Amino acid sequence: MENMAFNQRTVVMIGPGEHYVTAKNEVIKTLLGSCVAVCLYDPKAQVIGMNHFLLAADRRKFTHFLDSRAGYYGVHAMEILINAMLKRGAQRKYLQSKIFGGANVLSLCADNILNHYDIGGMNIDFVRHFLQRERIPIISEDIGGHCGRVIYFDPTDYSVYRSLIEHKYEEIASLQDEEYRYFNQASEDIHSSGVPVVIWSD
């Protein structure tokens, strides 16, 4: 997690597997490819939070996801974020969400085992399913496609500012490398985690 000054405000940068919650005048930033970020906020308590995660298996090929490192996979990433929001004074009944990411970035890697996976689509499906189940409304979304995204979550009016990473080859390559390492770590965790636990299925 990285802090940066931006327009005389602190910008907190989060990476894969991380989350951040604040009731201060801080902007939360992340860089997304196939990963997804959920921006949660309670406008009454004036608390915001964001996570950044990627699921480790293709649900069309496997019957379950495995419970592994907390914060890395969907249900845990969401539960950790929601619980952190509640600890800061948010109330579940007032939570609203905005979702971003899920681009077809990892599958664009040449000679990549992920060419056969719809990682971005899987993450989008999961987030929608989870939020619907938890009755947390999705106010807006910017998802899918083939471009990476940089997003900034502004606590003053709960806006999320987004720019696409379209033609910046070095940034895309770096993003692919980071998410590929993240996916490999998730896969290693799956193989070493022992007894499988169903955490989401249609």
Swiss-Prot record:
Name a Pfam family for this protein. CheD
Keywords on this record?
Answer: Chemotaxis, Hydrolase
Note the InterPro entries from the entry. Answer: CheD-like_sf (IPR038592), Chemorcpt_Glu_NH3ase_CheD (IPR005659), Cytotoxic_necrot_fac-like_cat (IPR011324)
Q: Name one GO molecular function term.
A: protein-glutamine glutaminase activity
Look up the domain of life of the source. Bacteria
Which family is annotated?
Belongs to the CheD family.
Q: What is this protein called?
A: Probable chemoreceptor glutamine deamidase CheD 2
